[in-house]
């Protein structure tokens, strides 16, 4: 079965079985909602078990979650450093113009027919995502995912077409 990374358990939270998760999910509210099924992987990326979310809340930059049947710190402390993943079957359907991070990371970015670089990371600083584009011999380009900049995303061909607005590329 194919799994996709959605977060890392970085610590426990209190004594009642809550865990502090650093999310790398594209849809954290959906991914960590009550009843969601996730898979737990150890620090060697080996499958441990399926888990069900019974509670979720945001606190600062973390998602605080609790698993079904794990209601005390002693039951969850061993999971610090483990990774949470979602199975491909549990990903859900997307609307037009929505993409999973794993679909975007690695895509080639072009302006007209000139290769700019490849998407290496996606940041969520505020109102819109920012795609970090790794370029040959230049600093990374921060590309806001907004309509005037990102013209098209071709998932099957792993290609993004953009129009760089003035001031976006400080090395040109």
From Swiss-Prot:
One of its GO terms (biological process) is rRNA processing. InterPro entries: PRC-brl_dom (IPR027275), PRC_barrel-like_sf (IPR011033), RimM (IPR011961), RimM_N (IPR002676), RimM_N_sf (IPR036976), Transl_B-barrel_sf (IPR009000). An accessory protein needed during the final step in the assembly of 30S ribosomal subunit, possibly for assembly of the head region. Essential for efficient processing of 16S rRNA. May be needed both before and after RbfA during the maturation of 16S rRNA. It has affinity for free ribosomal 30S subunits but not for 70S ribosomes. Disulfide bonds: none annotated. The PRC barrel domain binds ribosomal protein uS19. GO terms for cellular component: cytoplasm; ribosome. Belongs to the RimM family. Residues 96-168 form the PRC barrel domain. It is found in: Cytoplasm. This is Ribosome maturation factor RimM. Keywords: Chaperone, Cytoplasm, Ribosome biogenesis, rRNA processing.
